[in-house]
């Protein structure tokens, strides 16, 4: 029997009604109250997520920038201390190793935040391509991560932080902030389509911080949230999930994150030739939004057809709690990717009518 990994917060899940599942080898809460309630809390008030299963890798040294420029697609040279950047790592053929965040903590000090299911693979990939005076250290087990997301997230977090959180702009962060006396790195980032913060602290401090935030946020409607709501929220905001919208067989251009691929940067990064070609001449496939017109919910790997021709497949799909519609993301032949194109999805051996629609499905009002 495989032993599932647990985050430092595992022992407090039950107190808040957490129902756990096996998620990529981790025993994590899929929900606390209900996915719908948690989803709505984040869209209208605030939600608190345990994302300590995510991986953290430190890259340090004189050659850390040169090294990162070689292994990621975005231009890390534009990043200033106190800034965060979304990027991808690719194989030489343009397929995706992972998508990740890079935090620049110092001139020769970067923190990479990677997907839980890819920690070992990513670390080996990074370590095997190290150049010059750069070091790569996997610190995942030492670091916990909480995410507080939603329109009321700032007000709630401000109760336990003395620094003015308004000074932390989108994709910026402050390190060494005290959150209820606990040292943490606090960044205005997230995976929900809402405003909010991600808080990195030592593993041993996570449970205390979790309980404190839920206590001070109770009157504003802060709810403990699980993976179910995290997935429906990121899906509505059309944020890719590795293993679904991104994989070793799907390039960042196909997945719609071309903004994180800078083919004009000087460094010859892995996948550059393929990604440059796709940026300039178009990729063969495109990730599109689809709305099901008839009954049925599109799920991962369901085939998409026009007539008898299979043109692609669904990468993610759900009944959207916000839009009250059955929607999906699908990677399809670029010839059929225009909005309003009528397609069919095979749901349980039955063809169901659907239409290509614009994305993101949800965008918060500023």
UniProtKB/Swiss-Prot annotation:
One GO cellular component, as annotated: cytosol
Keyword Transferase included in the entry's annotation: yes
Protein known as: Aminomethyltransferase
Keyword terms: Aminotransferase, Transferase
Role description: The glycine cleavage system catalyzes the degradation of glycine.
UniProt xrefs under Pfam families: GCV_T (PF01571), GCV_T_C (PF08669)
Gene source species: Bacillus cereus (strain B4264)
E.C. number: 2.1.2.10
InterPro entries: GCS_T (IPR006223), GCS_T_bac (IPR022903), GCST_C (IPR013977), GCV_T_N (IPR006222), GcvT/YgfZ/DmdA (IPR028896), GcvT/YgfZ_C (IPR029043), TrmE/GcvT_dom1 (IPR027266)
GO biological process: glycine decarboxylation via glycine cleavage system
Family note: Belongs to the GcvT family.
Domain of life: Bacteria
Gene: gcvT
Catalysed reactions, semicolon-separated: N(6)-[(R)-S(8)-aminomethyldihydrolipoyl]-L-lysyl-[protein] + (6S)-5,6,7,8-tetrahydrofolate = N(6)-[(R)-dihydrolipoyl]-L-lysyl-[protein] + (6R)-5,10-methylene-5,6,7,8-tetrahydrofolate + NH4(+)
GO molecular-function terms, A-Z: aminomethyltransferase activity; transaminase activity
Subunit structure: The glycine cleavage system is composed of four proteins: P, T, L and H.
The UniProt record lists the keyword Transferase: yes
């Amino acid at each position: 029997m495989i032993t599932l990994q647990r985050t430092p917060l595992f022992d407090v899940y039950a107190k808040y009604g957490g129902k756990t599942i096996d998620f990529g080898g981790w025993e994590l809460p899929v929900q606390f109250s209900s996915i719908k309630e948690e989803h709505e809390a984040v869209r209208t008030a605030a939600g608190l997520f345990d994302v300590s299963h995510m991986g953290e890798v430190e890259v340090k040294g004189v050659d850390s920038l040169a090294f990162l420029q070689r292994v990621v697609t975005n231009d890390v040279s534009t990043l200033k201390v106190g800034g965060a950047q979304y990027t991808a790592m690719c194989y030489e053929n343009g397929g995706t190793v992972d998508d990740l965040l890079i935090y620049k903590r110092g001139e020769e000090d970067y923190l990479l935040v990677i997907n839980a299911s890819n920690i070992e693979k990513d670390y080996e990939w990074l370590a095997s391509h190290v150049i010059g005076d750069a070091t790569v250290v996997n610190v995942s087990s030492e670091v916990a991560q909480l995410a507080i997301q939603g329109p009321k997230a700032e007000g709630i977090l401000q109760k336990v932080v003395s620094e003015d959180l308004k000074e932390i702009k989108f994709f910026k962060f402050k390190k060494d902030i005290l959150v209820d006396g606990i040292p943490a790195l606090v960044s205005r980032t997230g995976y929900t389509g809402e405003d909010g913060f991600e808080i990195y602290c030592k593993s041993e401090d996570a449970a205390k911080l979790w309980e404190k935030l839920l206590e001070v946020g109770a009157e504003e409607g802060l709810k403990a949230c699980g993976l179910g709501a995290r997935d429906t929220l990121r899906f509505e905001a059309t944020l890719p999930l590795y293993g679904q919208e991104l994989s070793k067989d799907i390039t960042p251009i196909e997945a719609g994150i071309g903004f994180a691929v800078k083919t004009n940067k000087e460094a010859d990064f892995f996948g550059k030739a393929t990604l440059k070609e796709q940026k300039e001449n178009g990729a063969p496939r495109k990730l599109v939004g689809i709305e099901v017109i008839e009954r049925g919910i599109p799920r991962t790997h369901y085939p998409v057809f026009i007539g008898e021709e299979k043109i692609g497949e669904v990468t993610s799909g759900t009944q959207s709690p916000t839009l009250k519609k059955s929607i999906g993301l699908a990677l399809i032949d670029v010839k059929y990717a225009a909005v309003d194109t009528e397609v069919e999805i095979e749901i349980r051996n039955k063809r169901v009518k659907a239409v290509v629609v614009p994305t993101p499905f949800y965008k918060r009002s500023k």
